Amino acid sequence: MKVGSKELEASKVRVIVDKDPVATSFEKWAQPGHFSRTLAKGPKTTTWIWNLHADAHDFDSQTSSLEDISRKIFSAHFGQLAIIFLWVSQAYFHGARFSNYSAWLLNPTSIKPSAQVVWPVVGQEILNGDVGGGFSGVQITSGVFQMWRASGITNETELYWTAMGGLMMSALMVFAGWFHYHKAAPKLEWFQNVESMMNHHLAGLLGLGCLSWSGHQIHISLPINKLLDAGVAPQEIPLPHELLFNQDLMAQLYPSFKKGLLPFFTLNWGEYSDFLTFKGGLNPITGSLWLSDTAHHHLALAVLFIFAGHMYRTNWGIGHSMKEILEAHKGPLTGEGHKGLYEILTTSWHAQLAINLAMMGSLSIIVAHHMYAMPPYPYIAVDYPTQLSLFTHHMWIGGFCVCGAAAHGAIFMVRDYSPVQSYNNLLDRVLRHRDAIISHLNWVCIFLGTHSFGLYIHNDTMRALGRPQDMFSDKAIQLQPIFAKWVQSLHTLAPGNTAPNSLATASYAFGGDVVAVNGKIAMMPIQLGTADFLVHHIHAFTIHVTVLILLKGVLFARSSRLIPDKANLGFRFPCDGPGRGGTCQVSAWDHIFLGLFWMYNCISVVIFHFSWKMQSDVWGTISEKGKITHITGGNFANSALTINGWLRDFLWSQASQVIQSYGSALSAYGIIFLGAHFIWAFSLMFLFSGRGYWQELIESVVWAHNKLKLAPAIQPRALSITQGRAVGLAHYLLGGIGTTWSFFLARIISVG
């Protein structure tokens, strides 16, 4: 039989999915714990419900097939995307249905954004404050109005249709999650094809994502924002499709549109500089980055990422191989280098996740700092509550992601790490000198803690004794942050040399002019002094302690001098028996548990520093004659020198708004402030708990029930040590975040 060329082609095509691998059935939904033999038997004691929650998403414990685990994670990602689209959709829907967006668009400096109206039940309509323009609602601080203005949305109808689009995408994601698990599930080799994944993610997700956003900015956002900035009423602005297809209309705003694509193909790209700019600084009308700069930025990124998406070797014999890159990565002092990492990263999703969480966490923290230094959306810089909320939000997200990175790094060490596979590579070498790493980190923490705290204690003592001349301050013994000031001056002067065509510095935080919108300061040079030097070293201290705890958890996850067989005990275990000088709280899980408290300390100091510094030295008003008045009148430099100053002039002084909020539109923050304190205090009951005490108490309560012939069928058990810690930690963080949130918002909405 002769095989035709088509048949030959067909035989070459690899099948990378399994058809109908898992039947669709709702019967399992009715069997709690169906994924585990032990749990499927049903509850004998109250511990069952805890284990059910702990293990429901722990796919590793449900099957040993990496392919099945990969499919479950892949499918769950579609579920996650469905929820994200639903969440985005509701944000747009509230903007369309319950907001004062149109009024805000006409007067963004004196009308406050609101997209939430409370129903008149039990008198809670008091929360609908007067936000201006005859609208009553809850003032929102998410920055969505500013983002919608930047993307060229001019009315509520457009928001409504975008919300519908989000809803449809959400439904599509639910379908995709079902389809790729039950109908056409990818094989393991598809998940492990990293070169193809890198190419598609870089060129597709990032490259085409940036390109399409850049295209949207150029064709829709830029013309609409130019007209809005010129004072044209939103209802008179052409609709997006008119701008897209009517070249003459665009040419009136950006003359280079007349020339079409000719300059592009003749390489006269400079012709397009009317809408692809490199100005630097901020737009004085909106107090935000120039939209033509950000369009240019996204276009450049798109080119970069599309190039990057053609780097890896797939079907044609050109490009990089990830395995070869990693194995070639050797130095004279690093043994086998990165040999073995390819195998780790293609078989351990925990290792992948750990790296991605560390990167995303760091990125979120970088975003937090860029959001105020280089405000991206129109009028966002003069909306102080939004600026404070977004900074705080991105710092918290970053902190949680970094702790998650350590958690999954440790799970990888316990469940997926193979010492044989990693002989003498960098990972192995790090593990072998972990004692040196951890003891050095410990020394750094002791040094930073003693000295940074010591400077404050000195200042408190001197101020208490009435000896201000002996304090560390800008007026007495100066500890100026000379390196930070040098970096500031460098950035202020740099554009003249490195980007001669730009009009201003990248950020006015470094130096330059005061940018104000309608007399309200958007950004200005941030002066640094002794008070910043002191709190900076507290930041260094808390970051290093967090890293010490998390890194120790990862490096000692498998074994330690105290417990050499830790890997056999698993990721979380309460203790390993008595008699060795304490073996409780040594599991990798416990390190994450302890690390999260220090992360909380760390982020709290950062957001307190930011909140006070901005109110003291940046946010405020500027008169026509140029006189600047800050919200707290520049008191940071003198008050933040002592612990007493932080307590008195920041925490206590600025808490007056939240404490006195009852009976006003801010009263919800007053109640949350109180309730979150209670939740925080409730956590201590679990954190200082004695398990035996509770078990003993439960026995008495059960005895009483038995006496009354009311014996429960499910035997009550005290929480295990680990469960108690988990409950305590959750309430500690929830209470702490709720307290901070209500304190910040009541304060800044009142004075901002």
UniProtKB/Swiss-Prot annotation:
<keyword id="KW-1133">Transmembrane helix</keyword>
<feature type="transmembrane region" description="Helical; Name=IV">
    <location>
        <begin position="294"/>
        <end position="312"/>
    </location>
</feature>
<keyword id="KW-0813">Transport</keyword>
<dbReference type="GO" id="GO:0009522">
    <property type="term" value="C:photosystem I"/>
</dbReference>
<keyword id="KW-0560">Oxidoreductase</keyword>
<feature type="binding site">
    <location>
        <position position="694"/>
    </location>
    <ligand>
        <name>phylloquinone</name>
    </ligand>
</feature>
<keyword id="KW-0934">Plastid</keyword>
<feature type="transmembrane region" description="Helical; Name=VII">
    <location>
        <begin position="436"/>
        <end position="458"/>
    </location>
</feature>
<feature type="binding site">
    <location>
        <position position="575"/>
    </location>
    <ligand>
        <name>[4Fe-4S] cluster</name>
    </ligand>
</feature>
<protein>
    <recommendedName>
        <fullName>Photosystem I P700 chlorophyll a apoprotein A1</fullName>
        <ecNumber>1.97.1.12</ecNumber>
    </recommendedName>
</protein>
<feature type="transmembrane region" description="Helical; Name=XI">
    <location>
        <begin position="726"/>
        <end position="746"/>
    </location>
</feature>
<feature type="transmembrane region" description="Helical; Name=IX">
    <location>
        <begin position="591"/>
        <end position="612"/>
    </location>
</feature>
<dbReference type="GO" id="GO:0051539">
    <property type="term" value="F:4 iron, 4 sulfur cluster binding"/>
</dbReference>
<dbReference type="GO" id="GO:0016168">
    <property type="term" value="F:chlorophyll binding"/>
</dbReference>
<comment type="function">
    <text>PsaA and PsaB bind P700, the primary electron donor of photosystem I (PSI), as well as the electron acceptors A0, A1 and FX. PSI is a plastocyanin/cytochrome c6-ferredoxin oxidoreductase, converting photonic excitation into a charge separation, which transfers an electron from the donor P700 chlorophyll pair to the spectroscopically characterized acceptors A0, A1, FX, FA and FB in turn. Oxidized P700 is reduced on the lumenal side of the thylakoid membrane by plastocyanin or cytochrome c6.</text>
</comment>
<keyword id="KW-0460">Magnesium</keyword>
<keyword id="KW-0148">Chlorophyll</keyword>
<dbReference type="GO" id="GO:0009055">
    <property type="term" value="F:electron transfer activity"/>
</dbReference>
<feature type="transmembrane region" description="Helical; Name=VIII">
    <location>
        <begin position="533"/>
        <end position="551"/>
    </location>
</feature>
<feature type="binding site" description="axial binding residue">
    <location>
        <position position="677"/>
    </location>
    <ligand>
        <name>chlorophyll a'</name>
    </ligand>
</feature>
<feature type="transmembrane region" description="Helical; Name=X">
    <location>
        <begin position="666"/>
        <end position="688"/>
    </location>
</feature>
<feature type="transmembrane region" description="Helical; Name=I">
    <location>
        <begin position="73"/>
        <end position="96"/>
    </location>
</feature>
<keyword id="KW-0411">Iron-sulfur</keyword>
<keyword id="KW-0150">Chloroplast</keyword>
<keyword id="KW-0472">Membrane</keyword>
<keyword id="KW-0603">Photosystem I</keyword>
<keyword id="KW-0249">Electron transport</keyword>
<keyword id="KW-0812">Transmembrane</keyword>
<feature type="transmembrane region" description="Helical; Name=II">
    <location>
        <begin position="159"/>
        <end position="182"/>
    </location>
</feature>
<comment type="similarity">
    <text>Belongs to the PsaA/PsaB family.</text>
</comment>
<dbReference type="Pfam" id="PF00223">
    <property type="entry name" value="PsaA_PsaB"/>
</dbReference>
<feature type="transmembrane region" description="Helical; Name=VI">
    <location>
        <begin position="388"/>
        <end position="414"/>
    </location>
</feature>
<keyword id="KW-0408">Iron</keyword>
<feature type="binding site" description="axial binding residue">
    <location>
        <position position="685"/>
    </location>
    <ligand>
        <name>chlorophyll a</name>
    </ligand>
</feature>
<keyword id="KW-0602">Photosynthesis</keyword>
<dbReference type="GO" id="GO:0009535">
    <property type="term" value="C:chloroplast thylakoid membrane"/>
</dbReference>
<keyword id="KW-0004">4Fe-4S</keyword>
<keyword id="KW-0793">Thylakoid</keyword>
<keyword id="KW-0157">Chromophore</keyword>
<dbReference type="GO" id="GO:0000287">
    <property type="term" value="F:magnesium ion binding"/>
</dbReference>
<dbReference type="InterPro" id="IPR020586">
    <property type="entry name" value="PSI_PsaA/B_CS"/>
</dbReference>
<comment type="subunit">
    <text>The PsaA/B heterodimer binds the P700 chlorophyll special pair and subsequent electron acceptors. PSI consists of a core antenna complex that captures photons, and an electron transfer chain that converts photonic excitation into a charge separation. The eukaryotic PSI reaction center is composed of at least 11 subunits.</text>
</comment>
